[in-house]
UniProtKB/Swiss-Prot annotation:
Source organism, top-level taxon: Eukaryota
Subcellular location per the Swiss-Prot or TrEMBL entry: Virion
Quaternary context: The surface (SU) and transmembrane (TM) proteins form a heterodimer. SU and TM are attached by noncovalent interactions or by a labile interchain disulfide bond.
TM annotation in the entry: 459-479
Role summary: Retroviral envelope proteins mediate receptor recognition and membrane fusion during early infection. Endogenous envelope proteins may have kept, lost or modified their original function during evolution. SU mediates receptor recognition.
Entry GO terms, CC: plasma membrane
PTM statement from Swiss-Prot or TrEMBL: Specific enzymatic cleavages in vivo yield the mature SU and TM proteins.
Protein name: Endogenous retrovirus group K member 13-1 Env polyprotein
Molecular function in Gene Ontology: structural molecule activity
Pfam families per record: GP41, HERV-K_env_2
Length: 482
């Protein structure tokens, strides 16, 4: 929750409180028989480079015209979960009302007041009221988004954008909060805090490529490093129409996978090489028709062209300017708030641009890798490289781990495999495609010389003529004797 003071004086205060669904806090009981639970906190792994949040809201009567994020560190970090998958904490402030027992009265028991309301529709009327002889105080007064991060078994960077997914399932609820001191006839004062909400702002949270949202009944098995999801669906946006109890997993499209395959024919880099191979097979069967077939082959080769797929990336950027009314410049504080709003919008746009450029960079790298690889000509959806599969270097167990996206030393092995494939592709690129075939044709061309075919035929004809001549002579002698 976040609170913004609207009006304050000595005995009456008005606040605007904003609440939404977020990450579930890990809570514990301070005593076994106590009904109230408090969040589990820690002071380790504090976020560096951020100031501490203010300890209390700004005092004084004023009207707040804008709400600005101001990233800061709370006095303590809350623990979101401690599971086998890891320990997740958050140093962002978690606003809540707390009964102030600084007077050390033994009858006073500090406990948290949270807004655990149940929705009955978007515009449901909700009211919460607390009356106590002890004052209330607002804890964690900073206005900052949640920034969860994992600290065990490994460290991860903070994720200040994930809270938007949880907020989209419920919307942002606005509470009109009044806190006042009621004077009674007795010497004991009464503190009254009332929260009324009649307005919920529905929002929609979306992700951009290459990310998607996997929604459904998700079961994680950390020991097996496996995630099961039955009847799950992929979305790019979510809102309050989704079941708030469902699981949402942010997934990212992979650059590609490497698996060994077998071909039922020799690997060929272009259709022209395939045509030459088929024609040569036919020529070797009918050698005497080589001259006419070769003319047809040369005519066919003239019609075959090799095309290289190139990709152009254009980044379309639009700059929008906003005109502010002169009332925003009446005083320096409003001018400062306006400038801070502009800075926040620019920061959001820069963040979106950074993600877009990262995605475009990945696409360009994929295209570059695709253009560098020598692929089999008869496959367009995937690439079959000429690099032979070595089972000793890359066993099927490693291939299976790669398909399941398991880390460890497998990433290094896959990188080495890519380098070897690229080296093999560069070696193929250094020679003209099909040069070995044409070298074979050059060596076999003398065998297709028709004059060489006539030499053995000429000798056979002479021998046959001599044999016929001998037979005729013998026949003539026989006739004379008769």
């Amino acid at each position: 929750m976040w609170t913004v003071p609207s009006f304050t004086n000595d005995s009456y205060q008005v606040y605007n409180v904003f609440s939404t669904n977020s990450f579930q806090l890990l809570t514990v009981k301070r005593t076994p028989h106590e009904a109230w639970r408090v969040p589990l906190t820690t002071k380790t792994n504090k976020t560096k480079g951020l100031p501490d949040c203010p300890k209390k809201p700004t005092n004084g009567p004023f009207i707040v015209t804008s709400i600005l994020w101001d990233n800061c560190n709370a006095p303590k970090a809350v623990v979101l979960q401690t599971l086998a998958m890891g320990i997740v904490i958050d140093w962002a402030p978690k606003g809540h009302y707390w009964q102030d027992c600084s007077s050390k009265n033994t009858l006073c028991s500090e406990f948290i007041y949270s807004l655990d309301y149940i929705e009955h529709g978007w515009q449901s009327y909700t009211m919460r009221q607390r009356v106590s002889p002890y004052p209330f105080k607002w804890m964690d007064t900073g206005i900052a988004p949640p920034r969860p991060k994992i600290i065990h078994p490994f460290f991860t960077p903070e994720h200040p954008e994930l809270w938007k997914l949880a907020a989209a399932l419920s919307g942002i609820k606005i509470w009109n909060t009044t806190y006042q001191l009621l004077r009674t006839k007795t010497k004991t004062p009464t503190f009254n805090i009332t929260l009324i909400s009649e307005w919920v702002i529905p929002i929609r949270s979306c992700v951009k490529p290459p990310y998607m949202l996997l929604v459904g009944n998700i079961i994680m098995m950390p020991d097996a490093q496996t995630i099961e999801c039955h009847n799950c669906k992929l979305f790019t946006c979510i809102d309050a129409t989704f079941n708030p109890t469902t699981s949402i997993l942010l997934v990212r499209a992979r650059e590609g996978v490497w698996i060994p395959v077998s071909l039922h024919r020799p690997w060929e880099s272009s259709p022209s090489i395939h045509i030459v191979n088929e024609v040569l097979k036919d020529i070797l069967k009918r050698t005497k028709r080589f001259i006419f077939t070769l003319i047809a082959v040369l005519a066919g080769l003239l019609a075959v062209t090799a095309t290289a797929a190139t990709a152009g990336v254009a980044i379309r950027s639009s700059v929008q300017t906003a005109h502010y009314v002169e009332a925003c410049q009446k005083n320096s504080s409003r001018l400062w708030n306006s400038q801070a709003q502009i800075d926040q919008k620019l920061a959001n746009q820069i963040n979106d641009l950074r993600q877009s450029v990262t995605w475009l960079g990945d696409r360009v790298m994929n295209l570059q890798h695709r253009m560098q690889l020598q692929c089999d000509w008869n496959t367009s959806d995937y690439c079959i490289t000429p690099y032979a599969y070595n089972q000793d270097q890359h066993s099927w167990e490693n291939v299976s781990r790669h398909l399941k996206a398991w880390d460890d030393n497998l990433t290094l092995d896959i990188s080495q495999l890519k380098e070897q494939i690229f080296e093999a592709s560069q070696a193929h690129l250094s020679t003209v495609p099909g040069s070995h075939i044409f070298e074979g044709i050059t060596k076999q061309l003398p065998d297709f010389n028709p004059f060489k075919w006539l030499k053995p035929v000429r000798g056979s004809l002479l021998l046959l003529a001599l044999l016929i001549l001998v037979c005729l002579c013998c026949l003539l002698l026989v006739c004379r004797c008769l």
